[in-house]
């Protein structure tokens, strides 16, 4: 199995359905023995430029370990979900479990 980092930008009006959507994606990954090493909900953030006349989006980060078939199924689901504005899938050499820079920044702002 390979390691991947997945970043999703989700339509801000879909925040209520976010949990159901993410549990569906988790199910796809874990269905064939895949693992989620890190999950971060970055919340609603300002976009650098408007996408579909929107200025904000809900950001989510996954670091997963799964087979290629599961990844293709996940990407197919993401592709045809209108609530997903953008998606980025990056192949990684090993599992990443420590908090991302975005989460560290959020923790500093809270303190």
From Swiss-Prot:
Molecular function terms from GO: small ribosomal subunit rRNA binding; structural constituent of ribosome
GO cellular component: cytosolic small ribosomal subunit
GO BP terms, alphabetized: translation
Pfam families: Ribosomal_S6
Entry keyword Transcription regulation: no
This protein's UniProt keywords: Ribonucleoprotein, Ribosomal protein, RNA-binding, rRNA-binding
Domain of life: Bacteria
Family, as annotated: Belongs to the bacterial ribosomal protein bS6 family.
Function, in words: Binds together with bS18 to 16S ribosomal RNA.
Name recorded for this polypeptide: Small ribosomal subunit protein bS6
Organism expressing this protein natively: Francisella philomiragia subsp. philomiragia (strain ATCC 25017 / CCUG 19701 / FSC 153 / O#319-036)
Gene: rpsF
